[in-house]
């Protein structure tokens, strides 16, 4: 990492764009193309965290006016000397400034190379580097706060504490076995078991944070289901804020699964408006109904829409039991009309799907109650986005491997096997946790993380 890299660090088309340099010659390269209005402000002599206004030139050719900010190693994003040109945001202007700094001695940065350098220079951990991806992809307040929590080191600290406990247990076992003549405290199986159980509880919680984390980051896969003409499409259009589904009084109008991603409060829903669940002789509608059933099987959340202004139909009585044991909210629609569902019918529905709300999709009422009901059934009512949360498949794989090895160690200890055998399992668990943090991650694993980055990050 002795060379100096450069890249456009902002999306094109904005009013302001940035060209970023990082490396040992970043300030010198910047000085070759920058003409400050105040001649005393040379990039190489400016204090860190300061800026200067001037012109960017390629030889004698003026390219743009810009503000140059400088940061001195190790107090920068990458841990290296960094220079940032804030120019006008036109694509051609930025490309010309980038070409000028490359001609002056920098080389084009690779995808994710700035953050990779931050990792290699100890400015961030691997989990913190992964959080940068999540910040860029955040779709709502919760996902942004979760990503920022990871960037602040919430997951890294909790995983490292668990790994340290396991390493300490291994060291104690090794010292007691290998140096019996020394004054080493005897390993107490009950005390050791208590420590291991606490670590296992931590890993179990982290492993189960995966599903919540996915719902927060990627959105809740949601199927809107119900019989024909109960208001599913009206609800879809209300949630999406535009007409995505055809709304008529004719049953079977929606013949396929219509998908949309919407924000509902601080939640993101990946909605699927399904064809009405009913018997039909229309072969096209039959295909739509079959796709609806598949969407029902694969979703995280079911919004089951019923028409409160009429009694249950035989078809509804047939599919409602499928909600049992699922994360489902029963939506009694058309509350603006006289109710026709009986107390007995609502009681039978509550027996299979206890959470329900009454709304009028046509009038747009009841959304606040629906939002809270969704949080309740998917387990996000008390979700803390700043807590340690598993963010991706790599992290989940490490946690699962660690928990599996730890469970084997606990079972070996309880079964009275040798402490050597227990220690081997604990070492494997600790190794998996340290792989998660990046301390023992292979170059290939790190490469896969940075494959997800774009140039300039």
Model-derived segments and spans:
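A glycine-rich (often HGG/GG-containing) alpha/beta subdomain
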Residues: 1-145, 149, 153, 329-330
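C-terminal-of-GTPase-core extension/linker across diverse P-loop GTPases
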Residues: 2-11, 141-263, 280-282, 294, ...
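Glycine-rich, N-terminal phosphate-binding loop of Rossmann-like dinucleotide-binding domains
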Residues: 21-22, 87-89, 239, 274, ...
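Switch I (G2) and immediately adjacent beta-strands of P-loop GTPase domains
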Residues: 52-72, 252-280, 296-301, 305
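Inter-motif core of Ras-like GTPase G domains
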Residues: 285-309
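Conserved beta-strand segments of alpha/beta enzyme cores
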Residues: 107, 268-270, 355
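Short glycine-/polar-rich loops that comprise or flank the Walker A/P-loop
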Residues: 14-16, 49-51, 298-302, 325-328, ...
């Amino acid at each position: 990492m002795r060379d100096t890299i450069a890249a456009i660090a902002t999306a094109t088309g904005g009013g302001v764009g940035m060209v970023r340099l990082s490396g040992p010659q970043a300030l010198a390269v910047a000085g070759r193309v920058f003409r400050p209005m105040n001649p005393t402000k040379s990039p190489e002599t400016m204090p860190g965290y300061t800026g200067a206004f001037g012109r960017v030139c390629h030889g004698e050719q003026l390219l743009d006016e810009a503000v140059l900010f400088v940061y001195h190693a190790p107090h920068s994003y990458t841990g290296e000397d960094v220079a940032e040109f804030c120019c006008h945001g036109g694509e051609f202007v930025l490309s010309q400034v980038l070409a000028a700094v490359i001609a002056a001695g920098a080389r084009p940065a690779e995808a994710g190379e700035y953050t990779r350098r931050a990792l290699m220079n100890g400015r961030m951990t691997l989990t913190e580097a992964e959080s940068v991806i999540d910040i860029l992809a955040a779709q709502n307040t919760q996902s942004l706060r979760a990503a920022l929590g990871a960037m602040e080191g919430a997951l890294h600290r909790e995983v490292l504490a668990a790994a340290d406990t396991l390493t300490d247990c291994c060291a104690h076992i090794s010292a007691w076995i290998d140096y019996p003549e020394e004054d080493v405290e005897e390993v107490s199986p009950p005390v050791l078991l208590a420590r291991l159980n606490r670590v296992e509880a931590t890993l179990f919680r982290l492993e189960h944070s995966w599903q919540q984390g996915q719902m927060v980051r990627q959105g809740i896969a949601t199927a809107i289901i119900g019989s024909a003409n109960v208001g599913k499409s009206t609800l879809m259009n209300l949630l999406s804020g535009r007409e995505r589904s055809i709304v008529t009084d004719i049953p079977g109008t929606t013949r396929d699964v219509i998908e949309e991603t919407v924000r509902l409060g601080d939640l993101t829903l990946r909605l699927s408006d399904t064809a009405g669940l009913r018997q039909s002789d229309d072969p096209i509608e039959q295909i739509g109904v079959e796709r609806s059933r598949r969407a029902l099987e694969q979703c995280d959340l079911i919004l089951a829409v019923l028409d409160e202004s009429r009694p249950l139909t035989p078809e509804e009585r047939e599919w409602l039991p499928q909600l049992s044991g699922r994360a489902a909210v029963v939506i009694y629609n058309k509350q603006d009309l006289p109710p026709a569902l009986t107390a007995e019918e609502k009681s039978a529905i509550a027996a299979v799907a206890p959470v329900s709300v009454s709304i009028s999709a046509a009038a747009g009422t009841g959304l606040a109650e629906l939002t809270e009901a969704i949080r309740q059934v998917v387990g996000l009512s008390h979700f803390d986005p700043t807590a340690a949360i598993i963010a991706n498949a790599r992290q989940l794989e490490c946690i699962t491997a660690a928990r599996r090895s730890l469970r084997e160690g606990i079972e070996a200890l309880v079964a009275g096997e040798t402490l050597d055998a227990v220690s081997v399992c604990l070492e494997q668990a600790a190794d998996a946790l340290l792989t998660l943090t990046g301390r023992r991650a292979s170059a290939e694993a790190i490469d896969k993380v940075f494959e997800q980055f774009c140039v300039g990050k």
